[in-house]
């Protein structure tokens, strides 16, 4: 652990409903068990989330589905990255974003699979995922028919079937096109 690295990752990029969450994290001390959030159980992510928030400087940016629809995913990512970069300015010597695109934001280094290699990026991955999952559990209480507690807003068969039956909620990304719901050339 360097103490000079800020890791950034996001959750909810390809979902049909719910926010895009982008987190930046600079660890104050080493935390055992950090890994890519997708490789951890929900229980373990929650445990690590508590440790990370107590032992780091962090920022989480939550972007609504409406904003994604209005300005697009890339512009939303750019905005979130700029906010995180501004927050960590002067605290971090190196800012590493998981992926291969900077979305036009200067001062970022990108690294594919950084969430599996760099503790600070793993921590950011966990912060983003837990924040987003908690929002989806709240939405599941309001819209139980969509199965948000299980699918977290991603395009599962059951979720797509619910959209076909009930339509979109205000938390769905209306700009995202679902192939199976598009009219066929032969209809």
Feature locations, PLM:
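RNase H-like, Mg2+-dependent phosphodiesterase core
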Residues: 1-187
């Amino acid at each position: 652990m360097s103490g000079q690295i800020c890791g950034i990752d996001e959750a909810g990029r390809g979902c049909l409903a719910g926010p895009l969450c982008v987190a930046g994290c600079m660890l104050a001390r080493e935390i055992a068990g950090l890994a890519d959030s997708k490789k951890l159980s929900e229980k373990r992510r929650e445990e690590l989330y508590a440790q990370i928030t107590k032992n780091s400087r962090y920022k989480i940016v939550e972007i609504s589905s409406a904003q994604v629809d209005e300005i697009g995913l890339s512009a939303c990512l750019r905005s979130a990255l700029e906010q995180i970069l501004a927050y960590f300015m002067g605290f971090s010597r190196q800012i590493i974003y998981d992926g291969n695109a900077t979305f036009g934001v200067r001062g970022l280094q990108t690294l594919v699979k950084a969430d599996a290699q760099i503790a600070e990026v793993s921590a950011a991955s966990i912060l983003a995922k837990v924040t987003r999952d908690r929002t989806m559990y709240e939405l599941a209480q309001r819209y139980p028919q969509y199965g948000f507690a299980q699918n977290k807003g991603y395009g599962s068969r059951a979720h797509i079937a619910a959209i076909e039956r009930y339509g979109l909620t205000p938390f769905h990304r209306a700009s995202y096109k679902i192939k199976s719901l598009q009219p066929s050339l032969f209809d």
